[in-house]
């Protein structure tokens, strides 16, 4: 949580370092997912898209189904940023399917907004 707050206020490198330390020091699979996921977001916001991609992929190794939907959606946003719209759409659709299956209406709407935004970019 602290690492994500650091990312939000613009201290992305510090957020990445803190999340990495959490990842290496925890035995909790849930904490490994979130620390790696936050690392991906911090790297993305600092402009390191390759590092972010690796972190998002690695986070999926520790993801439960709901967490996987977060990883897919954020990874999809990264792919929108780099212009890989086809892969982003696939990731959004996969995240949407998980969220619909889990009956998470709040998250379904978030993913639908991401899909609509991508559609606007394509037109």
Regions picked out by a protein language model, each given a short descriptive name:
Residues 19, 23-26, 59, 63, ...:
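Eukaryotic all-alpha helical interaction scaffolds
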